[in-house]
Regions:
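Boundary at the C-terminal end of the N-terminal hydrophobic targeting segment
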Residues: 16-21
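Core nucleic-acid recognition elements
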Residues: 382
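Glycine- and acidic/polar-rich repeat regions and solenoidal domains
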Residues: 97, 347-351, 369-376, 389-708
Length: 736
């Protein structure tokens, strides 16, 4: 398995690919009045490269109008940082052709940065005694201040509950931290007062975690422990950021006031959609008094003053300013972007709308506020061999195709290294979003984020040969791959992926493949799961195939539930018709759906809430817990086909205790009184439940999964199962 992506080998592979047609050059020492045909200014400085991207684009347009560039063109961008005042946009008139693409690339091995930022300079010591008194004594000698307006920066953006980031500060190539308390980790909501003038959220009646209060119920106030806020000056623009009720949903909330005597915070509407719940995590931010560590900064938006404690040895700073994509391809086709770094913007690095056969390859996306690349519409657009990290939102959006006709969009993300993303919004952001029909994500390395890896929203997607690890590090009830709540999202294949070291602090744990809320018609095959939490979760859906996977030290390897018969029965009793409406929206009873997915014709039978026709065959599992079955008392597990698996886990089955009444609570580890039992390997009931499978103790023959070796030992029980070997050496990015 390839564990590391050596970016520069990929850059040289992609950016060094041959490009035909006329060659042009852009340089920081160029001039848009020149021909752009020289790589450097001529001796007499009468000709040379262009100076700007826009200048080169406009010159190419003129050449095409004259009938030139029929073989395409290559625009070589010389090294340096190019600050963009506005989005660099290419439209249909800038397109290449199949035989003559237009390539915009970094010249040879030179490093090219397209930046949406501005330098922040003119820092001085804090001399205002009123400000100095608010700083901690240890910070006063280190904190500097500058007026952003003479720096040419007047738009600071706004902090909104679920929007992208406003102005951010970078120094030494790293994102700096808005002054916060606590500096690391989280505070906890001490309580949520249950009285007031306005009840903003009635809460979730079925989930009462503490003191009999429905989760999320609030009157716009929370309380805190400790005395720290008593030091802070009221009236400054203070915020809190937290996971307010669920560990899969965060938001920023502005503080209206703090009653330090009662240790009570009144929050300014709009409030978090799921309310506020006792003991949930949060921290305070944008508080001058908490600017107390190197790398922290505070912005007084009213005065335009930025306060900063620079890290040792750092003398430069840059603020993100451009609140638009750095580069946009609008209806453009046969265009390639290669070997370029996109940095310091508040939104996407590259946005592609419509058009076809565009590629972004061997590029670096970092220190951005939005997604790295957003592809919306068009056909056959892709992102290849790019390094995406330290972006405020997600990595790559693949959106396209026509769902009603099942026409594929054919977008792809291949051979990318995507990590340390979702730095601003901590949930709802992904390494890759697949939306529409017929996209593929393959040979990527995805790791280290607070939330999930890939979201699937559509049909006929393929996710293969990817490695996922250390995801969901701050969250819970989340999966490395996540989908759900639409019966028509079918035909998706998840195969030959490696999931390992998945663990999060949040409620409900984390999953490898999360087929949430009745996701149906998925194939999960040939995957490797090592310490991957609840490795494969079937959340009430049907027609899913979980075949020929290896599970090691997972808890559990496979989860099956019938939530539609329990806590989520309101999806089937007429309270909401969401699932059925989505089927009608796709005209499921007529072609192409009736032919491609004939199982949909049976979804409205007499028992649509029962997880029928799931198939779990030929898997190997050991060292953890084989299966959790929730709502166990509500349905007959025999509707799920479970056979020919090698099961060697210490615990075979986790289910609700006999005699327990009511819905399965699904709470997991709140008060340890949930009424679940674990049936060990050797238990007679568990043996009966899983008859038709080979139940063993100890390693059944997987060679050395702790070292990433999942090959099967010859003549072992696992090998004799007839297991089809997983092509493990092909997993992850190609090239080292």
């Amino acid at each position: 398995m390839k564990r590391f992506l050596l970016l520069f080998s990929l850059v040289s592979t992609a950016a060094g690919a041959p490009a035909g047609g006329d060659e042009f050059y852009i340089s920081r020492s160029g001039n848009d009045a020149w021909s752009g045909k020289l790589a450097a200014p001529s001796t007499g400085k009468t000709d040379g490269p262009f100076r700007t991207l826009a200048g080169a684009r406009d010159a190419l347009r003129l050449a095409k109008e004259k009938g030139l560039l029929t073989a395409g063109a290559t625009v070589n961008v010389r090294g340096g940082t190019y600050e963009l005042e506005d989005t660099f946009t290419l439209t249909a008139e800038d397109s290449g052709s199949a035989s003559g693409p237009v390539v915009w690339r970094a010249f040879r091995d030179e490093r090219v940065f397209l930046s949406g930022g501005k330098p922040v300079t003119h820092f001085v010591r804090v001399t205002d005694p009123a400000v100095a008194r608010r700083l901690r004594p240890a910070a006063r000698a280190h904190v500097l201040v500058t007026d952003l307006r003479p720096n040419g920066i007047a738009d600071y953006g706004e902090i909104t509950p679920r929007g992208g980031p406003p102005l951010e500060l970078f120094a030494g190539g790293r994102r700096m931290t808005v002054a916060r308390y606590p500096n690391d980790g989280w505070a906890r909501i001490a309580d949520v007062p249950q009285s007031g003038d306005t009840l903003y959220n009635r809460g979730l009646e079925r989930e009462k975690r503490y003191d009999g209060v429905p989760a999320g119920r609030h009157y716009g106030r929370i309380t805190y422990d400790g005395k720290e806020p008593s030091r802070w000056m009221q009236g400054q623009e203070m915020y809190v950021h937290g996971y307010w009720t669920f560990d899969w949903s965060d938001s920023y909330q502005q503080i209206q006031s703090i009653d330090t005597a009662r240790r009570e915070i009144t929050l300014r509407p709009p409030h978090h959609g799921y309310g506020y719940t006792k003991n949930q995590r949060f921290y305070f931010l944008n508080i001058l008094e908490e600017l107390d560590a190197p790398g922290e900064w505070y912005l007084d938006r009213k005065a335009g003053l930025l306060y900063f404690w620079p890290p040792a040895g750092i003398h430069d700073a840059e603020a993100s300013v451009l609140a638009k994509p750095l580069v946009a391809l609008e209806g453009c086709s046969w265009t390639r972007l290669e070997g370029i770094s996109f940095v310091c913007g508040r939104r996407e690095g590259v946005r592609i709308r419509e058009g076809h056969d565009n590629t972004v390859s061997a590029c670096v996306f970092s220190n951005l506020g939005g997604d790295a690349v957003a592809i919306e519409g068009g056909f056959h657009n892709g992102v290849v061999s790019c390094d995406v990290h330290d972006v405020g939102m997600g990595g790559i959006l693949l959106k396209g195709g026509e769902r009603k006709t099942l026409t594929p969009g054919g977008h792809y993300a291949e051979n990318n290294h995507i990590h340390d993303y979702s730095t601003w919004l901590r949930t709802g952001q992904y390494a890759v979003v697949m939306d529409g029909v017929g996209h593929r994500v393959e040979h990527n390395l995805i790791h280290d984020s607070p939330f999930e890896g890939i979201a699937i929203r559509g049909n006929d997607m393929v996710i293969e040969y990817n490695e996922f690890h250390n995801l969901m590090k701050e969250t819970g009830d989340a999966g490395a791959i996540h989908t759900g709540r639409d019966w028509t999202w079918r035909g998706n294949v998840i195969r030959y992926n490696y999931f390992h070291d998945l663990k999060g602090p949040g409620l409900h744990g984390v999953m490898g493949v999360y087929l949430d809320d009745w996701a149906s018609g998925f194939t999960v095959t040939g995957n490797l799961f090592y310490r991957a939490g609840r490795a494969t979760m079937i959340g009430g859906g049907r027609d899913n195939f979980v075949v020929n996977n290896i599970y090691v030290e997972c808890s559990p390897s496979i989860h099956v539930d019938a939530r539609g018969l329990g806590w989520a029965s309101y999806y089937f009793d007429g309270t909401t018709n969401e699932l059925f409406t989505k089927m009608d929206d796709m005209n499921y009873s007529r072609p192409p759906y009736s032919r491609r997915y004939p199982a949909l014709l049976h979804m409205e039978d007499s028992t649509p809430a029962v997880p029928k026709y799931n198939t779990i065959i030929g898997n190997i599992s050991y060292g953890g817990r084989w299966m959790d079955v929730y709502d166990y008392q509500a349905f007959d597990l025999s509707v799920v086909t479970i056979r020919n698996n090698v099961i060697a886990d210490p615990v075979l089955l986790r289910r609700r205790k006999d005699g327990e009444k009511g819905w399965d609570p699904y709470y997991l580890d709140i008060d340890m009184k949930e009424g679940y039992v674990a049936l060990p390997n050797g238990d007679t009931e568990a043996a009966r439940t899983f008859q038709g499978n080979l139940i063993l103790k100890g390693n059944p023959g997987v060679r050395a999964p702790e070292r990433g070796d999942f090959s099967l030992i010859a003549n072992s029980a696992a090998a004799n199962l007839g297991f089809t070997p997983v092509p493990a050496s092909e997993i992850g990015p190609r090239g080292k």
